[in-house]
């Protein structure tokens, strides 16, 4: 995928972004089935919207993913969609768990996010970083 460019109409592009989302109040909820369901939901969103998830891992309070997207999409819109759809899905499935953690509003993610385009860094480097970070964090 690194050297492949997408073509659409008169556009030729290769856009990839490394995104990190953090749970509200850094609650350590991204474990077990919740982590698995968040990852699956993000994959579903990507498939529906035409994004490609290149790499994705969770730690207890945040998730990293490397995403390839269309030139007509904006990163802020991608993040908004991912946050909204995963939050809605998780509250439907884990209402009893989440209502004990967030009792005022149906929230899951913190307000902000980290996003970094990888134009100067190879996709393989970011994939390795995500995998190594995940392995290192799980060991501690």
What spans do the regions from the language model cover?
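Conserved small/polar residues in nucleotide/adenosyl-binding loops
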Residues: 135-140
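Basic nucleic-acid-binding interfaces
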Residues: 1-134
């Amino acid at each position: 995928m690194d050297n492949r460019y997408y073509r659409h109409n008169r556009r030729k592009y290769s856009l990839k972004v490394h995104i990190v989302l953090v749970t509200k109040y850094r609650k350590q909820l991204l474990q077990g089935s919740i982590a698995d369901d968040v990852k699956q939901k993000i994959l579903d969103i990507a498939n529906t919207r035409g994004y490609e998830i290149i790499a994705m891992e969770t730690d207890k309070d945040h998730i990293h993913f490397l995403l390839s997207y269309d030139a007509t999409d904006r990163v802020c819109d991608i993040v908004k969609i991912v946050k909204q759809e995963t939050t809605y899905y998780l509250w439907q499935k884990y209402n009893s768990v989440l209502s004990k953690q967030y009792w005022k509003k149906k929230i899951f993610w913190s307000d902000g996010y980290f996003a970094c385009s990888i134009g100067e860094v190879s996709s393989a480097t970011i994939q390795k970083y995500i995998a190594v970070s995940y392995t290192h964090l799980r060991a501690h």
